[in-house]
Amino acid sequence: MEKLRLLGLRYQEYVTRHPAATAQLETAVRGLSYLLAGRFADSHELSELVYSASNLLVLLNDGILRKELRKKLPMSLSQQRLLTWLSVLECVEVFMEMGATKVWGEVGRWLVIALIQLAKAVLRMFLLIWFKAGLQTSPPIVPLDREIQAQSRDGDHSSGSQEQSYVGKRSNRVVRTLQNTPSLHSRHWGAPQQREELGVAPTPLGLQETIAESLHIARPLLHLLSLGLWGQRSWTPWLLSGVVDVTSLSLLSDRKGLTRRERLELRRRTILLLYYLLRSPFYDRFSEAKILFLLQLLADHVPGIGLVTRPLMDYLPNWQKIYFYSWG
């Protein structure tokens, strides 16, 4: 146990001293998951295991860095724990579904899916009702930007209380000072942005917004319940889920006063409505043939594009069959 504790302390020290190298390690692990997919029997399960591990690694390293940088989330310890558990579930849900299918078959698969969705819904309702956490964003905990954190640490040591930018008297343009201009390889050539702090408190929700968010949280459970009642080939679960999603977004149409992250979350949910084109039974009856025909057409007539479209054609049917990919 003592050796494990010392090993953990060494790893924490390495992460805090080398955030950029840690990010490269995370990227390498994630890249390995892409290389493993489709290489051999059970490669999809192994690939998903490695991908889940990379996401958990990011979550662990971010926690270490936040502790070192004293960038605590603006919430209680209990709320942080709920968000952490929710993040862990989102990291491993696909692998758990695939593993349950491999070990217990379809019955075990749907049981695991139902338990995970129920756990996520309970956690989110606690966050919404008890902790007044506002809109539930994805991912639940925003990953740290390692490059920005490294620059901010260097800036804290070097610039002290110096102004990082000034406003031109005539043009009113915000310009970096020379002392705070980053190195050439890491410089952003646009105008310096006023970054929104991760510690901004969520926007308080009124009754209408709370109902809308409750619908969004309950939608996966309603979909699973309707699947059990009417079956996977019925249009009822597909239509019910779509109506709930559209209703939730309609009730959240007033975006005044929302934080930048909350506006991005609503935009993400709107874009995800396109997933209904890839969800059964619509995909089976309408989308599948057209999408595969288009990908084959691109592969045959556009030089080089086949390197991307042909693996995508092979992987798309497997992707569509995994619940947490298409419906999660």
UniProtKB/Swiss-Prot annotation:
Residues 66-81 are annotated as: Required for peroxisomal location. InterPro entries: Pex16. This is Peroxisomal membrane protein PEX16. The chain crosses the membrane at residues 85-105, 111-131. It comes from the Eukaryota. Pfam families: Pex16. Residues 149-169 are annotated as: Disordered. GO terms for cellular component: endoplasmic reticulum membrane; peroxisomal membrane; peroxisome. GO terms for biological process: ER-dependent peroxisome organization; peroxisome membrane biogenesis; peroxisome organization; protein import into peroxisome membrane; protein targeting to peroxisome. Residues 106-110 are peroxisomal. It is found in: Peroxisome membrane. Required for peroxisome membrane biogenesis. May play a role in early stages of peroxisome assembly. Can recruit other peroxisomal proteins, such as PEX3 and PMP34, to de novo peroxisomes derived from the endoplasmic reticulum (ER). May function as receptor for PEX3. Belongs to the peroxin-16 family. Keywords: Membrane, Peroxisome, Peroxisome biogenesis, Transmembrane, Transmembrane helix. Interacts with PEX19. The keyword Nucleotide-binding does not apply. It is a multi-pass membrane protein.
